[in-house]
Amino acid sequence: MNQDLVEEATAQIKSLDFSKSVVMFSGGKDSLVVMDIAKKAGLNKSVYINSELEFTISRRYVEQMKENYNIEDVIPKIDFFEFCRRICPPSKRLKWCCKVLKLALSMKHAIKTGNFYQLTGIRSDESDRRSKYEVINADPFINVNKRYRFFQVNPILYWSEEDVWDYIRENKLQYNPLYDRGVKRVGCWCCPYTTRSEWELARDLEGENFQKFKNIIKDFSRNLPANFRNRYNKKGWRSFATNYNKIEVLKMTNNKNSFVLEGKKEYLEKIEHLIFIVADRYKIEGSKLYFERNIELQRRQIRLVLEKPLNCVGCDVCTVICPVNALYLENESIKVDPTKCVGCLSCCKNINGKLKMGCIARNYKTERFCITF
């Protein structure tokens, strides 16, 4: 084992403020090495995002590792299968799963605990994209909340896979049993990027959940054109993408800064959850909602905010974007706390990157309720 690599990683970890740092343990070999080096350096604090998409073997392994390491589970409030029903099964082109079940959870945990320096097992030789990473990244993909800065720390960025295994063997670390089954990279068993052998392993090891996912794929295919259903059920779901079905439920008109939304009361009551963000004053009369705004705001920005509650699936992603924590979920529906909202409009500005304007439903649901103007 190259001890210089270990010393460099140790020094990097020791340079951090431990009160603001945490190891993001995935159950894989790379983050295992980081977690062990961090513990020896004095940082025995790890988080495992338990999305319940990992192999059962992996989750049991993480439980065993808690005997030697301080690992906290972070679990989504709504499970993967329910999100599949509310949004769609994930695919290579509709990758909502990582945003909802990984990224947003890690951001919420950082905001809650103050652990904004997240140590990972990322290595530069894993992909072309990761070869461009630095040891400490002010992650541009998750810096959408202007109040906080999130840092990704990669202590073993320049290690090779052989270096990782050498460290594990020399330190007699207990690694994930999945590697002994030929798995190259520990991850989600139902990932659309899985190889054929990994898919077969999932079928063998995750029998009940595997069948549940297959049934969800089959149920979803019933809404597709007849000539595509069979292909979708077999392998087509992996690369699936389609134009969404636009369901117009409200019509918006305006005269300068006076606006009228017209439609069924049930939809008006939903947008009432967020109307405070874009309106100085408002009232509902029958099938119409009247509101005024003194500061000029583009209609598409107003629509971006008000379509959130119309399509909300309870994913919690948009709440991590608000810099004053004014957005929250109640009964799995997005709402705003008027006592916290400062009118910064972060929730309706164009947010590039992984969180896609902070609304998973507006970007990935195949049927979306819309406001027209």
Task: Enumerate the language-model features and the residues they cover.
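Nucleotide-activated chemistry modules centered on ATP-dependent adenylation/adenylyltransferase
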Residues: M1-Q301, V305-L306, C359-F373
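Local cysteine-cluster metal-coordination motifs and their immediate loop/turn environment
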Residues: V100, K184-S197, L310-V324, T339-G353
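Short linker/helix segments within small regulatory modules
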Residues: D180-V183, Y328-K340
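Long, compositionally biased, intrinsically disordered segments
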Residues: G286-S287, N311, S333
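Intrinsic-disorder/low-complexity linker and hinge segments
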Residues: I302-V305, C322, V336
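Iron-sulfur cluster-binding cysteine motifs and their immediate structural context
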Residues: V317-S333, S346-I371
